[in-house]
Regions:
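Soluble periplasmic/extracytoplasmic beta-strand elements of cell-envelope proteins
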Residues: 48-52, 86, 110-112
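Short, glycine/proline-biased beta-turn/loop segments that scaffold the active-site neighborhood
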Residues: 97-131
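Conserved SxxK-family serine transpeptidase/carboxypeptidase catalytic domain
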Residues: 243, 264, 268-298
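Active-site SXXK
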Residues: 78-106
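Active-site-adjacent helix/loop patches that line small-molecule binding or acyl-intermediate pockets
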Residues: 22-32, 44, 115, 126-259
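Extracytoplasmic
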Residues: 44-47, 66, 72-74, 78-83, ...
Length: 298
């Protein structure tokens, strides 16, 4: 973490002092021992860096200038919690698709989640001022505190097939979303979702979805990680295999951000199917901290 802060400070310094210079190159050549120690062991640390400068022409056209270090889309990159970003986006997109089919629900419509057998998974969210479980509130929690349960609930609202087909359709071809953040979770069959009006009448019910799309294992460089891991409280003394773990390349991750901030530079096919209000909502909560939120109030 300290190294990340060092690099960030150097980027800011060089942006101010050397505006026409290759900023990333200058930062990586800085004699700071922490940076140089990592660079001497760059294969061990699996460093990939993508720095993008945003420029506007006199006619307000958006241009991106990139600098990169060891970017390799053939090398596995585990996205960790950043995988929650496209899930939040696609939840809003699916809501728009449902509306276009005559389903009268919004991001603030309360719902509950149950199993196929009818057992309730969750019906209230105690972090909501009124105890409501809503799509908008789950998205807020993802951006504010990287809430794993919020991601899991949105994952199943979408279904794994929808997630991966939509991301591929948008040109994000180095991305696969395999799983929830829940030990022992069923990532193939979803829970059921029931949306209610203020009088508790059912507005929309989504039955369990079954994933049919066969996801190809990540046959990339670097899918073996570490030298041991815990499985059911037993130490396994060999690297963990990440062939069937979530994957987003750094360029695809940047591409998702660019589609949110600058959607108009992409073709209609590459853009997410979002409204202006959706974009405003995403940008607002992506930029907020817990101190700037009173619902949820952490």
């Amino acid at each position: 973490m300290l190294i990340k802060y060092h690099l960030l400070l150097y980027f800011l310094f060089f942006i101010k002092c050397y505006p026409q210079t290759a900023i990333l190159d200058l930062a990586l050549k800085h004699p700071d021992p922490a940076i140089q120690e990592v660079l001497r062991n760059k294969e061990k640390h699996e460093i990939q860096i993508l720095l993008t400068k945003i420029k506007r022409t006199p006619s307000e056209e958006i241009l991106f200038e990139e600098e990169d270090y060891q970017i390799d889309e053939r090398r596995y990159f585990y996205p960790a919690s950043t995988v929650k970003l496209p899930i939040a986006v696609l939840a809003l997109q699916k809501l728009n698709i449902l509306k276009s089919k005559g389903v009268i629900i919004t991001g603030d419509t309360p719902f509950f989640i149950s199993t196929k057998e009818g057992d309730t998974i969750i019906q209230r969210d105690t972090t909501h001022n009124k105890g409501k479980l809503t799509l908008h509130h789950l998205i807020k929690k993802i951006f504010l505190v990287s809430d794993n349960d919020a991601y899991n609930y949105l994952f199943d609202f979408l279904g794994r097939d929808y997630i991966n087909m939509e991301l591929t359709k948008r040109g994000l071809n180095h991305t696969q979303v395999y799983h929830k953040f829940l030990f022992g979770a069923d990532n193939v069959n979803t829970w059921e979702y029931t949306f209610l009006d203020k009088d508790q009448n059912v507005l929309y019910h989504q039955s369990s979805l079954h994933a049919e799309l066969e996801l190809k294992p990540n046959k990339l460089k670097g899918v073996l990680k570490g030298k041991g891991y815990n499985s059911l409280d037993v130490l396994v003394n060999k690297p963990m295999i990440f062939e069937q773990k979530n994957r987003i390349s750094i360029r695809n991750l940047q591409g998702i951000l660019q589609r949110i901030i600058f959607p108009d530079i992409f073709s209609n096919q590459e853009q997410f199917d979002l409204t202006d209000e959706d974009y405003k909502f995403l940008r607002k909560w992506m930029s907020r901290t817990t101190l700037e939120s009173n619902n949820p109030n952490y």
